[in-house]
Amino acid sequence: MDVNQPKQEHLLALKVMRLTKPTLFTNIPVTCEEKDLPGDLFSTLMKDDPSTVKGAEILMLGEMLTLPQNFGNIFLGETFSSYISVHNDSNQVVKDVQVKADLQTSSQRLNLSASSAVVADLKPDSCIDDVIHHEVKEIGTHILVCAVSYTIQSGEKMYFRKFFKFQVLKPLDVKTKFYNAETDEVFLEAQIQNITTSPMFMEKVSLEPSIMYNVSELNTVITNGDWKGSSTFGTKTYLQPLDTRQYLYCLKPKPEFAEKAGVIKGVTVIGKLDIVWKTNLGERGRLQTSQLQRMAPGYGDVRLSIETIPDTVRLEEPFDITCKITNCSSERTMDLVLEMCNTNAIHWSGVSGRQLGKLHPSSSLHLTLTLLSSVQGLQSVSGLRLTDTFLKRTYEYDDIAQVCVVSSKLQAES
């Protein structure tokens, strides 16, 4: 939309054109039956038309390229490029010509002029050309303000402006979900939907983690001999309009932070997504989300997690598990007592009610326990109780892990 000031006779003319990639020319084929009145007239005209594909004239898509006929859509993350030309339409020399281009957004005003130098003399039929570029980082209304100032031969200073308004639209709809694992791992599921009217080539979708985490992408399938793996989306990574794609990432605490239970517990900032795509004829767009935040998991004052446990055990034969007990409090030292309560299927081996000693804030201890199962099948490990003798508070831990119990005879045969 071009909103100009009241018309005034100026010696200079300002032209602004948005620079975009050309598109393939399309035409509407008109055909008829051979017995109809036109006969082969339409087919002959289409064969002579240079915009049609030879041998496939009835296809709407041609081989010729066409320049944009209108301003078109601009999406967040794309680069806005424009060609600005100031031409001297008069028959006299104009002095001290200066061209300035600003971009006004809802929050700021940016100077896009490549050079602010003043042109001393602009002869008749001469012009000043400039190309501006700007990576669009805000949605909503944008106004390109082009201002021209110059001095005519009489010494009078002249000035005029032109305004070009355009809307920046949102290209992608990004939704995220977090899943907190017992091992301090965080799984991020990112759903990305193409809300434009044209397909996109998804060049890169990566997660830049915060300083406390390492990230691994779970969007590839490892095949025989291919250590790099292949994409779960196949070789053609096009995202059609209104299609949605899901990406999965696993974040693990770095070793220097993994033992600091209180620090990891309170971390809410996970990182940010970096998305790069291409549209028609390779036009690139890039979008970075703001810092993604999760709800901090509530482990309570004491956290018990399983470090090692066998997948399969024999019926009525002892096996060992390793537990990690963490004091999640940042201020209080705990004096813990461990009690082991048998269930219908799980029986603990050892002394119940033993002292574990003092556990300082944000510190952990590892504990190896022995148990056996009297029932076959998939059994849940339950029955652990931790009592803080200072506060006389008991913490119950049930269904902390699962183990497959098979008979000794079955395992021997396998």
Curated annotation (Swiss-Prot):
The protein, known as: Trafficking protein particle complex subunit 13
Family in the record: Belongs to the TRAPPC13 family.
Subunit and interaction comment: Part of the multisubunit TRAPP (transport protein particle) complex.
UniProt source species: Xenopus laevis (African clawed frog)
InterPro entries listed in its UniProt record: TRAPPC13, TRAPPC13_C, TRAPPC13_M, TRAPPC13_N
Superkingdom per UniProt: Eukaryota
GO cellular component, one term: TRAPPIII protein complex
Pfam families attached to this UniProt entry: TRAPPC13_C, TRAPPC13_M, TRAPPC13_N
Gene: trappc13
